[in-house]
Amino acid sequence: MNMLVTMLINTTLSFVLILIAFWLPQLNIYTEKANPYECGFDPMSSARLPFSMKFFLVAITFLLFDLEIALLLPMPWAMQTQDIKTMTLTAFILLSVLALGLAYEWTQKGLEWTE
């Protein structure tokens, strides 16, 4: 009986919220609210906008460094192991690769936005 009452309340509340969601937006329609927002671009214009290659390279570099940092996330669980030297060596190698990659990008001016 208790489960039936709970399901009835949940179903009723869901239907009431759905009806409110469909009824409420029709009260005040503005032209600005009706237009979709596309990150500052006009959605009716051409989709072939010029794309900054520098932005693309910085975005790819960010993704690569983000994936390398994700390799370090299991380290707290690895600290529970009996072989602490292997875990420390692995963490040091991962951080070294990350630091070397950052130094390489810095020397090649891959992180500079303006040239």
Curated annotation (Swiss-Prot):
Record's GO cellular component terms: mitochondrial inner membrane; NADH dehydrogenase complex
Catalytic activity from the UniProt record: a ubiquinone + NADH + 5 H(+)(in) = a ubiquinol + NAD(+) + 4 H(+)(out)
Pfam families, A to Z: Oxidored_q4 (PF00507)
UniProt GO molecular function: NADH dehydrogenase (ubiquinone) activity
Main location per the UniProt record: mitochondrion
One Gene Ontology term from the biological process aspect of the record: mitochondrial electron transport, NADH to ubiquinone
Gene3D superfamilies: NADH:ubiquinone/plastoquinone oxidoreductase, chain 3
Membrane topology category: Multi-pass membrane protein
EC number per UniProt: 7.1.1.2
Segments passing through the bilayer: 4-24, 55-75, 86-106
Subcellular location: Mitochondrion inner membrane
Keywords: Electron transport, Membrane, Mitochondrion, Mitochondrion inner membrane, NAD, Respiratory chain, Translocase, Transmembrane, Transmembrane helix, Transport, Ubiquinone
Oligomer and partners: Core subunit of respiratory chain NADH dehydrogenase (Complex I) which is composed of 45 different subunits. Interacts with TMEM186. Interacts with TMEM242.
Function: Core subunit of the mitochondrial membrane respiratory chain NADH dehydrogenase (Complex I) which catalyzes electron transfer from NADH through the respiratory chain, using ubiquinone as an electron acceptor. Essential for the catalytic activity of complex I.
Family, as annotated: Belongs to the complex I subunit 3 family.
Protein name per UniProt: NADH-ubiquinone oxidoreductase chain 3
Name of the encoding gene: MT-ND3
